[in-house]
Amino acid sequence: MDIDALKASHMRHWNRFHQLAHSRRLTGPEIDELSVLYRQVTADLAKVRSQNPDQDVISYLSGELLHARARLTGTSGASLWAISRWFRHDLPAALYRIRYVTIAIMLIFIAMTALQTWWILRDPAALSMLGSPEQLKNYATTEFSSYYSQDTNASFMSYVWTNNAFIALRVVAGGITGFYPIMALWGNAQNLGISAAVVIHYAGPAHFFSFILPHGIPELTAIWISTAAGLRLFWAWLVPGRKTRGQALGEAGRSMITVGLGMVILLFLCGAIEGFVTPSDLPLWLKITCGVNLTAGVWIYTFVAGGRAYRAGVSGDLDEDAGYATPVI
């Protein structure tokens, strides 16, 4: 690599980077621009170090990066900016990276659940293995619906949120094993299929879907996304590409932590629906609309905001300059 040619082709954005890093005040768009340039200059520094370690250029870029990093973290309102950037760029980009895996998992889950439900409904022997007719009827007509009103709305919401958030984070973290997310997905599909078969057989499909759909659609979406995130972690370990296994796993891990935190937020909203909307006297269409709108919002957020952020070079990494790419003099 010709270092002079590199300097000539990159000097324009290096100068802009210097100008922003040394500005006394930065607007919101300028902070975003500085953040983007920070990643570009970090990549430039890595290229120089690996292909033509010119000490003058390395010292210059390292100094500029250190100054910019201090500028970003020391900017008034930087915490609010970081939170805003996380919602506008990091989280949607991380979701966008696993969008197709999430869709595939969704289809597999629906197929497994439908198959389990169909098999139990068509086979009286399979249904009888789940309990006596009296027990199953009591579950379908009483226990299934009373579950959603067993406590105060706020307490029940808190319970389901913390329980589901823990499951989602465990699925993401357990992704490194490769099999844990699949086992969790299979278990959820089987349990939902059994519940669906029993309730549909004894109380009818309307009774089942009226209690499941309002919160179930976005809640299951969170589980599917968490499963995809966990499997992405396993894939990074299995197939690191041109990076070392540690680098690939570290980057994927930080990105998937972003997804995990996003799912905690989504499941909080699901918990609010399950705790306050599902057991309420609202019209069924309005209950289902709440869940559908939340789910649609997640997918729009993923494809629109996520696609935009991903094309801008954002990966969802919690600290894209961390570890081996940290600029030091």
Region roles according to the model:
Residues 82-98, 147, 155, 246-247:
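Cytosolic juxtamembrane amphipathic/interface segments immediately preceding
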Residues 107-122, 218:
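Hydrophobic alpha-helical membrane-insertion segments
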Residues 152-180, 194:
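Individual transmembrane alpha-helix segments
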Residues 174-329:
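Generic detector of multi-pass transmembrane helix bundles and their immediately adjacent loops
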Residues 117-142:
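Interfacial/capping segments of alpha-helical transmembrane domains
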Residues 1-84:
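Soluble N-terminal domains of membrane-associated systems
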Residues 139-159, 209-218:
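Short aromatic-rich membrane-water interface segments that cap or initiate transmembrane helices
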Residues 93-111:
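Alpha-helical transmembrane segments and their helix-start/interface "positive-inside/aromatic belt" motifs
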